[in-house]
Amino acid sequence: MSIYLSNKYLKIYYNIVKRSFDRTPPKTYEKHHIIPKALGGTDNSKNLAYLTPKEHFIAHLLLLKITEGSNKCKMAFAVNLSLIHI
């Protein structure tokens, strides 16, 4: 079974990440793991996107929407952690 469900949220997530590669990093940015470390992602530069704080929070909300099973719990934890920084 796939980690991600194929849906509109995945497309929005993809567009946020893709946009980050098509621009210079914003003045205020946060590093985002495209494939979250909790799901097997690495710190490799190809797995990092430079997002604004708002984009970063939205990206984590989208990951929560597109994951399933035990991975959904991991993404919920990540969303809760990101609330600390707001």
What is each PLM-predicted segment?
Residues 1-22, 64:
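Short helix-coil boundary/hinge micro-motifs
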Residues 5-9, 55, 75:
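Alpha-helical structural motif
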Residues 13, 49-50, 77-79:
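Generic preference for hydrophobic/aromatic residues in regular secondary structure cores
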Residues 19-51:
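Histidine-centered nuclease catalytic patch
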Residues 27-35, 57, 66, 74-81:
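Charged, low-complexity intrinsically disordered segments
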Residues 48-74:
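Short Cys/His-centered divalent metal-binding micro-motifs
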Residues 84-86:
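Conserved small/polar residues in nucleotide/adenosyl-binding loops
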